[in-house]
Amino acid sequence: MIKKSFISVISHEEKEKNRGSVTFQILSLTNRIRKLSSHLELHRKDYLSQRGLRKILGKRQRMLSYLSKNNRIRYKELINQLDIRESKTR
């Protein structure tokens, strides 16, 4: 597992105040996604972890779409900081 790939964009004081904010939740989901991805590189046949990864990806995608509708500027900044592709609109 690679521990250096985890992100700490938000300072420690902001973490204590804003645990429920959308940006903090997206950040924590991204860390969980990267942790599970590195696990699945070693254990390719761990199908329960693959299912969990898909669930987390869907949850992050819904939160990103919510953020893009409500605060487009913060959405763009967060995508650039986390190095995530922009979602396709349907």
UniProtKB/Swiss-Prot annotation:
Record organism: Morus indica (Mulberry)
Biological processes, Gene Ontology terms: translation
Signal peptide start and end residues: none
Entry's family note: Belongs to the universal ribosomal protein uS15 family.
GO CC, one annotated term: ribosome
UniProt xrefs under PROSITE patterns: RIBOSOMAL_S15
GO molecular function: structural constituent of ribosome
Pfam families, alphabetized: Ribosomal_S15
Protein name: Small ribosomal subunit protein uS15c
Top-level taxon of the source organism: Eukaryota
Quaternary structure annotation from Swiss-Prot or TrEMBL: Part of the 30S ribosomal subunit.
Stored HAMAP family: Ribosomal_uS15_B
Ribonucleoprotein found in the keyword field: yes
Keyword Ribonucleoprotein in record: yes
InterPro entries the UniProt entry points to: Ribosomal_uS15 (IPR000589), Ribosomal_uS15_bac-type (IPR005290), uS15_NS1_RNA-bd_sf (IPR009068)
Primary localization class, coarse: plastid
Gene: rps15
